[in-house]
Amino acid sequence: MKKKYILAIDQGTTSSRAILFDHKGRITGMAQREFTQIFPQPGWVEHNPRDIMTSVYTTITELLNNTQIDVRAIAGIGITNQRETTVIWNRQTGQPIYNAIVWQSRQTKNICDQLTTAGYQDLVHAKTGLLMDAYFSGTKVKWILDHAENAHTQAARGELAFGTIDTWIIWNLTGGQVHVTDYSNASRTLMYDIHALRWDPDLLTMLDIPAAILPDVRSSSEIYGLTQTPYFHGEQIPIAGIAGDQQAALFGQACFEPGMAKNTYGTGCFMLMHTGKKAVESKNGLLTTIAWGLNGEIEYALEGSIFIAGSVVQWLRDGLRMFGKASDSQAYADRVSDNGGVYVVPAFVGLGAPYWRSDVRGAVFGLTRSTTKEHFVRAALESMAYQTRDVLSAMQADADIELKELRTDGAAITNDFMAQFQSDILAVPVLRSQIAETTALGAAYLAGLATGFWSSREEMTQHWAINRCFKPQMDKEQREHLYAGWKQAVAATLGFRVA
């Protein structure tokens, strides 16, 4: 039968999606299912790994039922996932020994503090390109092994398996036959040497984690195994692509050359710049990460993570009740010609790149009696653009590459005011992608390359299309004046201590 589709499984922090793409990279069907978030203590975030798989299976079933396609027309499956989230399970039974600890969770902060005090930060940064932070998988693995009954003994005997969510999904889809991850996900674990391309024995010793629990690390585009579940009507479909969500979005945006960058405007912002086959060490508060591994070669990226972006709009809507729908924010911002001197620094959970200060909290500056709701909303939207410039400035300094354009996706950038202001503050064109689901598209592309569904990256570049291009309209003097005000507001925020 002719292969007409690639299936992408996009497993995110709050929901799972199954999306079908055709040969032109167009969406032909989609299903989505949310699952329960677990908050055992303040700052802790967990998922039931079984709930994740149930949501994956449900979306596959709904998609196939809704589209009525012949399963045999699916050439392959690509998987993209919330990164860093950690699962450990029993190899024999397939049962998790504890909940999945989510990337957002801060429950391993004490472990990070102890390792930093012990002097391990430089070792971690040199080998992994990351920081000693609870964000990454390594300390989550240690926490589970330390707290689950008899876990260290079982792990040492090789009875347990660790995986990020991609690994957990593939294990289940293949009936427990395949225990793998890809370079992009391995590079986010705090245990993988991104230069030597191996699980690092020094880092494993530091964390007291036995190598026996680790998955094989493979390229981001190859056939890892075949499905062995009833959800595909008994058909064995190749699982052929893996990438962490932000790297998948970089691939889906066709950022294939050094200096090309994308920014995803979701709850937070994740900006990645392709740096080619060279791992660029950041001296400006960014992360060095593996973008993907293809055709025997590794390509790298610089990443800046902004903790609060689109969620500032949710705060205005739900917390302050300034408007009824998130989309109303654009109309409020457009009613005033400027921010009225108001700056919102949305450090609700601290500041991410390039500051990395988890101890600071949000602040608002410049309020007067003439400040209106419209000024406040505009200032909150502007904060996303300022934070993106903070990250871009660090990227350009680290990579010594001048950005020519910024490719964007995510819900917040559908706001035309936000997109135009972003272009003005960066002084570069902002290109909004025609397809919003660039993360899933990236996973589909990787699977399509491995199965021959697509022939080359050049073919994918031809498929990439712009919804709209926003070009800078602000003069340099005004741009720098506004950004100077932001830097002053951030400096004041960093200096404030909560009693």
Swiss-Prot record:
Pfam families: FGGY_C, FGGY_N
Class of the enzyme per the UniProt entry, highest EC level: transferase
UniProt-annotated binding residues for ADP: T13, R17, T267, G310, A411, N415
Binding site for sn-glycerol 3-phosphate: T13, R83, E84, Y135, D245
UniProt cross-references to Gene3D superfamilies, sorted A to Z: 3.30.420.40
EC number(s) on file: 2.7.1.30
GO CC entries: cytosol
PROSITE patterns: FGGY_KINASES_1 (PS00933), FGGY_KINASES_2 (PS00445)
Record's keyword annotation contains Iron-sulfur: no
GO MF, one example: ATP binding
Residues the record lists as binding glycerol: R83, E84, Y135, D245, Q246
Regulation acting on activity, per entry: Inhibited by fructose 1,6-bisphosphate (FBP).
Binding site for ATP: T13, T14, S15, T267, G310, Q314, A411
Catalysed transformations (reactions): glycerol + ATP = sn-glycerol 3-phosphate + ADP + H(+)
InterPro entries reported for this sequence: ATPase_NBD, Carb_kinase_FGGY, Carb_kinase_FGGY_CS, FGGY_C, FGGY_N, Glycerol_kin
Gene Ontology biological process: glycerol catabolic process; glycerol metabolic process; glycerol-3-phosphate metabolic process
UniProtKB keywords: ATP-binding, Glycerol metabolism, Kinase, Nucleotide-binding, Transferase
SUPFAM superfamilies linked to this entry: Actin-like ATPase domain (SSF53067)
Pathway the protein acts in: Polyol metabolism; glycerol degradation via glycerol kinase pathway; sn-glycerol 3-phosphate from glycerol: step 1/1
Similarity field: Belongs to the FGGY kinase family.
Reported function: Key enzyme in the regulation of glycerol uptake and metabolism. Catalyzes the phosphorylation of glycerol to yield sn-glycerol 3-phosphate.
Protein name, as recorded: Glycerol kinase
Natural source organism: Xylella fastidiosa (strain M12)
